[in-house]
């Protein structure tokens, strides 16, 4: 087994007792990566030399100056810029790009004393649900290497599930933290839009993107979100809302809490195993004193279409900056500027990215703007109103994270519509801007299933409270992939 089986609190206790050093933890991360990443394929870039030197220095820091995450290793998704460490967004067009500054969240990790061990694979520019859209490699699911880890933060979830690192950061535009967390049997939180700074996150869809933590348990997740959250003057969309002590919310008490279960989340298209695991989870929470009632979110049926119009429209604008002029890949053997733009983008972007750029450009064009983009914005307003109405009477909403467990690698690669439908249960929360978490709640043929808990704006604390209570009443979070054994 690995040191990373333990929680942050347990690791800090071992360090304080003198049984473990920060250098030991960093060494463990790189040894695990060396042993397992040939199979998992999670990491794109390593920070070993700097991280090892940093760990040796951090062991000298007095205990009274250390926080709960001090000295612990973390992997960072490759669309979050890291000064001096290659950031590619898993795209050919950014191959070799070396950022000259750190994202705000990376600065916050450093302030918390965490050690960035490397950059994690993803679907190119965060567009995908399987990690198969990466230009560099396809990350595998640690529970079954023939299956996908989810996307787009698939490697962020897989690296934690495999025990390569105990923490990672991902980004979530339509489910890209929660769906991989469900597929890999770990805990993934999409915070409220604006809770975490997006400064230094390479933009896909600016009104939807949000950075969040992936961990093995709820308490560690709460600690990491507290470390990265908060107002940032460099991000005009970050919210000036106080960041609470999330760990203090983990009381285990959910008596009197009101839980809404949308009938749309357990209806047609949701697999029987996913449905039954959610119903069983609701029984656990009822047994702990919560009340459960069925509700309706009637406009959820428009979410998938609205999301792909809006996100693709924003992507077509955001990705126009990648043209081969100032950084990244540049096409060769071109004779004029227009050909340079065309060839650089044609060769540098993958098929899925080009598909979404075209979809977005079409949606924003003069003849179709009202019929597509404007209508999608109206649908988004209705979806948000549905959530506002439910949250007048309920504390959280619960349903499955994904309709099914992880599918096989290659199974949906030529079927974009089926691939898009994998996010049908996570997309509405991004459109509404509300926070949501995925935690392990069961298995289907040896593959994990996720329970999604959705909360009110900026009320991640209540989500953590419910998630922690369920976690403590069950054993799902303690189960690990077979590859942990003897490694």
From Swiss-Prot:
GO CC, one annotated term: glutamyl-tRNA(Gln) amidotransferase complex
> What class does this enzyme belong to in the EC scheme?
ligase
Keyword Ligase in annotation: yes
- Some GO term, biological process aspect, for this entry: which one? translation
Q: Which Gene3D superfamilies match?
A: Amidase signature (AS) domain
- Reported EC number(s) for this entry are 6.3.5.7
Q: What are the catalytic residues? A: 77 (charge relay system), 152 (charge relay system), 176 (acyl-ester intermediate)
Show the GO MF annotations. ATP binding; glutaminyl-tRNA synthase (glutamine-hydrolyzing) activity
* UniProtKB keywords: ATP-binding, Ligase, Nucleotide-binding, Protein biosynthesis
Catalysed reactions, semicolon-separated: L-glutamyl-tRNA(Gln) + L-glutamine + ATP + H2O = L-glutaminyl-tRNA(Gln) + L-glutamate + ADP + phosphate + H(+)
Q: Any idea what job this protein has?
A: Allows the formation of correctly charged Gln-tRNA(Gln) through the transamidation of misacylated Glu-tRNA(Gln) in organisms which lack glutaminyl-tRNA synthetase. The reaction takes place in the presence of glutamine and ATP through an activated gamma-phospho-Glu-tRNA(Gln).
Q: Which family does it belong to?
A: Belongs to the amidase family. GatA subfamily.
Q: Which PANTHER family match?
A: GLUTAMYL-TRNA(GLN) AMIDOTRANSFERASE SUBUNIT A (PTHR11895:SF151), TRANSAMIDASE (PTHR11895)
Q: Which HAMAP family match?
A: GatA
Q: How does it assemble?
A: Heterotrimer of A, B and C subunits.
What is the protein name stated in its UniProt record?
Answer: Glutamyl-tRNA(Gln) amidotransferase subunit A
| Species classification | Bacteria, Bacillati, Bacillota, Bacilli, Bacillales
Give the gene name: gatA
